[in-house]
């Protein structure tokens, strides 16, 4: 028997022979393998698919010249999807990179593209310094950049889509000495690549193993480097088995496509809660150390120092931010509430100092919050953001409602908040949107409406607290804008303050905003807002990891056992994971009941348990200097915010917002309780 067929028979004997579903034929697919001899430029060998006799689902992939590998493929039809099982066996010691393309048959110009947590539509909201169509209409990326190892292509003209995803145990990664060019891996990796390419005007799914990134690799914030191609060592006689799944279906629009893709990925990768030793009570008790140790009292404003800290020191500084990223006022309220619940006089007293100082010294001449003050430099940001102003009002309305519930009133604060809500009404545009940034005299700095949903929350809360219907009407107008410009167009962007691109927070805030309106309305109106919440929630969910990316030995996050499922990618520009969740888990729990969808509540539990893993405490500091200062920029792929790379944090972080986010995660149903009173 021919040696090639002997190896082939051994490798695929256990596979089941079934018919194909998608039109998977040699004319619609191509494959190649690149081989590298150390010290030499790799050579690529196109592979021809030769169907085996008497076996309609098995192929031998042969090069036109002799190569020291046997490459075979079996195609199986399982539940209407095509499983592609590739077997690569080494006849000699080799370094290889395998890649394959499958044509969708769609015109590339008619398509929108999707790589979960990283690529939405054409990424045209992103700057040219980040991956987008501004640079190229074809992109290949390593799988660990994505919240699920999948690429989808949606044809708007045909209302059809095709996806490819990989199945594996995903247990290994390996270090390399270089981040670009042809690189030989120092060991085994489980990370392949996926993406889309324009092949003569036709949209094509591309995938392979080990990883490759082209035409650029995104290695640092706003830094594209030359492409990279990794080569895996395969010893003579060893075999690698790789599995990809192709699927195609119909979807009325891009939003419905995202829903189908997320549900498929959720069912495929089936993320389960992460076991940790920390209860919710443990988390709050440990994080409360941040409230105590970060307090700064020597300036006109009293605040928790929670931004721009060094991870290896956590020394306090003089920078105070009302909203994101410091969340000074929300932290003060959380500390106050926790202090009353647990008889912590220190927390109650500290929070009172924060509130009193902001009431006295925390407002601009026009009456807005001094949202970002740097006492170290004696500067104050003259530009306001709708997001930070809204987050400040949100925190204070929680505070006022809590105090009122317990028999304590603060008339000066009430008047300040009513004045600010009235000022928001002046800022609102005719289409219901709010400008992203503006000056103290109400002149507009950035008219973009992507941050609009952040204002919906305090407007609904203001209506509930002050019984002023103008605030509810304003909130409903924001929802009309969200529906018309973001949700219906599947275009969620510009919510973060340190990036202006497609991001998780825009869809998360949109879902939370319409959730608030669902809680305060009735009948058909309530159902309409609930439907919008559900639609936006799928986009937010698509940013959260459904699998555990592997780390190499020596990368701290892997060495301490981090499981990435349940963590959220941030944005196209900021390709790291974090614990930004706030009330979103409560939104998911509510949606689960409203629509009888257990995936929502089940995944909320995955998020809740997974985000407990990096709790810093004595003996388990997780690379952070102080107990309770929860890490922020968690770098899980070949990217960094500026320092340290995969497996580590950036050297600067902002525990002010991470503690606030987790605190709301572990205080479920807060909005429902507030708005039901």
List where the protein language model places each region:
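Aromatic-lined, polymer-binding surfaces characteristic
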Residues: 385-389, 445-456, 486-489, 497-511
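Low-complexity, Ser/Thr/Pro/Gly-enriched N-terminal "stalk/linker" regions
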Residues: 22, 27-31, 36-46, 234, ...
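Bacterial Sec-dependent N-terminal signal peptides
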Residues: 1-22
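Well-ordered alpha-helical scaffold segments within catalytic/enzyme domains
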Residues: 329-345, 391-409, 454-468, 509-525, ...
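Extended, well-ordered alpha-helical scaffold segments
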Residues: 257-294, 343-361, 405-425, 467-484, ...
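Glycine- and aromatic-rich loop/turn segments at beta-sheet edges
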Residues: 288-320, 360-382, 424-444, 483-501, ...
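Beta-strand/loop-rich accessory regions of lumenal/periplasmic or secreted enzymes
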Residues: 24, 40, 53, 63-67, ...
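Active-site lining segments of carbohydrate-active enzymes
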Residues: 377-380, 398-469, 484, 534-544
């Amino acid at each position: 028997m021919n040696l090639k067929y002997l190896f082939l028979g051994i490798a695929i004997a256990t596979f089941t022979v079934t018919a194909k579903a998608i039109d998977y034929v040699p004319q619609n697919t191509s494959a190649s393998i690149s081989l590298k001899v150390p010290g030499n430029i790799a050579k690529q060998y196109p592979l021809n698919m030769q169907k085996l006799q008497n076996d309609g689902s098995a192929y031998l992939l042969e090069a036109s010249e002799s190569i020291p590998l046997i490459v075979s493929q079996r195609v199986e039809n399982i539940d209407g999807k095509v499983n592609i099982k590739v077997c690569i066996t080494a006849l000699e010691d080799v370094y290889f990179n395998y890649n394959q393309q499958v044509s969708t048959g769609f015109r590339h110009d008619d398509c929108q593209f999707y790589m979960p947590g990283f690529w939405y539509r054409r990424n045209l909201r992103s700057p040219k310094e980040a991956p987008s169509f501004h640079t190229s209409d074809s992109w290949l990326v390593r799988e660990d950049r994505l919240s699920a190892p999948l690429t989808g292509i949606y044809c708007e003209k045909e209302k059809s889509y095709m996806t490819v995803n990989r199945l594996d145990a995903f247990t290994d990664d390996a270090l390399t000495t270089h981040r670009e060019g042809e690189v030989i891996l120092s060991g085994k990796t489980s990370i392949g690549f996926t993406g889309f390419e324009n092949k003569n005007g036709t949209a094509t799914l591309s995938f392979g193993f080990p990883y490759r990134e082209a035409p650029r690799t995104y290695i640092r914030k706003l830094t594209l480097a030359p492409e990279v191609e990794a080569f895996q060592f395969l010893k003579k006689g060893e075999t690698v088995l790789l599995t990809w799944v192709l699927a195609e279906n119909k979807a009325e629009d891009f939003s419905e496509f995202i829903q189908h893709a997320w549900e498929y990925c959720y069912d495929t990768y089936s993320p389960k809660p992460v076991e940790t030793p920390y209860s919710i009570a443990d988390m709050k008790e440990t994080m409360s150390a941040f409230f105590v140790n970060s307090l700064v009292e020597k300036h006109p404003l009293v605040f928790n120092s929670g931004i721009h800290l060094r991870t290896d020191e956590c020394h306090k500084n003089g920078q105070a931010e009302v909203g994101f990223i410091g969340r000074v006022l929300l932290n003060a309220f959380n500390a106050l509430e926790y202090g009353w619940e647990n008889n912590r006089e220190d927390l109650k007293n500290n929070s009172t100092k924060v509130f009193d100082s902001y009431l006295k010294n925390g407002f601009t001449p026009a009456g807005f919050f001094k949202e970002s003050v740097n006492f170290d430099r004696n500067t104050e940001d003259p530009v306001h953001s709708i997001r930070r102003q809204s987050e400040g009002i949100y925190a204070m309305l929680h505070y006022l409602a809590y105090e009122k519930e317990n028999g304590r009133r603060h008339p000066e604060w009430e008047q300040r908040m009513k004045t600010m809500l009235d000022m928001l009404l002046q800022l609102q545009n005719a289409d219901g949107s709010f400008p992203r940034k503006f000056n103290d005299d109400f002149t507009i700095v950035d008219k973009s409406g992507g941050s609009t949903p952040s204002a919906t929350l305090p407007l609904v809360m203001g209506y509930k607290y002050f019984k002023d219907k103008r605030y509810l009407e304003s909130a409903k107008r924001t929802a009309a804008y969200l529906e018309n410009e973001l949700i219906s167009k599947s275009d969620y962007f510009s919510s973060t303050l340190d990036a202006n691109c497609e991001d998780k927070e825009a869809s998360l805030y949109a879902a939370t905003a319409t959730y608030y309106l669902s809680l305060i309305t009735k009948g058909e109106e309530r159902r309409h807002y609930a439907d919008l919440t559900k639609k936006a929630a799928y986009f937010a969910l698509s940013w959260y990891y459904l699998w555990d990316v592997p780390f190499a030995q020596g990368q701290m996050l892997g060495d301490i056992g981090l499981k990435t499922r349940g963590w959220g990618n941030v944005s196209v520009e900021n390709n790291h994971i974090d614990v930004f969740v706030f009330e979103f888990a409560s939104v998911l729990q509510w949606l689960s009941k409203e629509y009888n969808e257990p995936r929502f509540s089940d995944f909320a539990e995955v998020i809740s348990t997974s985000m407990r893993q990096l709790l810093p405490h004595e003996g388990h500091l997780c690379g952070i200097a102080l107990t309770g200062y929860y890490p922020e920029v968690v770098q899980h792929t070949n990217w960094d915010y500026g320092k340290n790379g995969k497996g580590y944090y950036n050297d600067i972080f902002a525990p002010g917002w991470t503690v606030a986010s987790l605190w709301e995660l572990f205080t479920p149903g807060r909005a429902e309780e507030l708005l039901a009173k």
